[in-house]
């Protein structure tokens, strides 16, 4: 049979004592259960401890509470700030040039509607107009089809008032709108 051996190195840090004591108690509870069905050896685990003998004894809780302090209890107090930041440090941190809002130099005027927009980006006002017109066309198509899954597999052409279908539009589905064609909606 193999002899179990545990080596503990004790630090002068007071929170480490509680942590080591908890691990030692847990180890003592788990050892008899570690090999069910096999007789336990007549000897216990060998322990090498550098420090006072109080670490090898289980902690007797006099308050009646059975809660053991865990490793997290000793870590949470370490994460708390120990000193207050000075006002100079706070101002430097808050007014850091990397954190300030950058000035945009790529603002342009939309040539269609005159609203402000970013360069190389579609104008939000014009995009909203296109979305509304597209939604109206889709609503009209839905009324003609009578259902969402009854669309024919042919190409669709949108005609506005005063427009007639061309020779290229023969055999295509034609949607007629009761208004003038918008300037931004090309016929092709």
Curated annotation (Swiss-Prot):
One of its GO terms (cellular component) is mitochondrial matrix. The keyword Ribonucleoprotein applies. It holds the Pfam family Ribosomal_L32p. MRPL32 precursor is processed by the m-AAA protease (composed of AFG3L2 and SPG7), which cleaves the N-terminal transit peptide. Cleavage by the m-AAA protease takes place prior to assembly into the large subunit, an essential step for mitochondrial ribosome (mitoribosome) assembly. Proper processing by the m-AAA protease is dependent on the zinc-binding region within the tightly folded C-terminal domain of MRPL32: zinc-dependent folding halts degradation initiated from the N-terminus and triggers the release of mature MRPL32. Keywords: Mitochondrion, Ribonucleoprotein, Ribosomal protein, Transit peptide. Disulfide bonds: none annotated. Residues 169-181 have a biased composition (Basic and acidic residues). This is Large ribosomal subunit protein bL32m. GO terms for molecular function: RNA binding; structural constituent of ribosome. Zn(2+) binds at residues 110, 113, 123, 126. One of its GO terms (biological process) is translation. Belongs to the bacterial ribosomal protein bL32 family. Residues 164-188 are annotated as: Disordered. It is found in: Mitochondrion. Component of the mitochondrial large ribosomal subunit (mt-LSU). The mitochondrial ribosome (mitoribosome) is a large ribonucleoprotein complex responsible for the synthesis of proteins inside mitochondria. InterPro entries: Mitoribosomal_protein_bL32, Ribosomal_bL32, Ribosomal_zn-bd.
């Amino acid at each position: 049979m193999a002899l179990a051996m545990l080596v503990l190195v004790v630090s002068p840090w007071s929170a480490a004592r509680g942590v080591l004591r908890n691990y030692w108690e847990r180890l003592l509870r788990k050892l008899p259960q570690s090999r069910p069905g096999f007789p336990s050896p007549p000897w216990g685990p060998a322990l090498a401890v550098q420090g006072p003998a109080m670490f090898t004894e289980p902690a007797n809780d006099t308050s009646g509470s059975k809660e053991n302090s865990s490793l997290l209890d000793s870590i949470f107090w370490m994460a708390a700030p120990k000193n207050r930041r000075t006002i100079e440090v706070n101002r430097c941190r808050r007014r850091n040039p990397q954190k300030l809002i950058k000035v945009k130099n790529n603002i342009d005027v939309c040539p269609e509607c005159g609203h402000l927009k970013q360069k190389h980006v579609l104008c939000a006002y014009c995009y909203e107009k296109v979305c509304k017109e597209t939604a109206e066309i889709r609503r009209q198509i839905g009324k003609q089809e009578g259902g969402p899954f009854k669309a024919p597999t042919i190409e669709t052409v949108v005609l506005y008032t005063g427009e007639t279908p061309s020779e290229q539009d023969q055999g295509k589905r034609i949607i007629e709108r009761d208004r003038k064609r918008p300037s931004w909606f090309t016929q092709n």
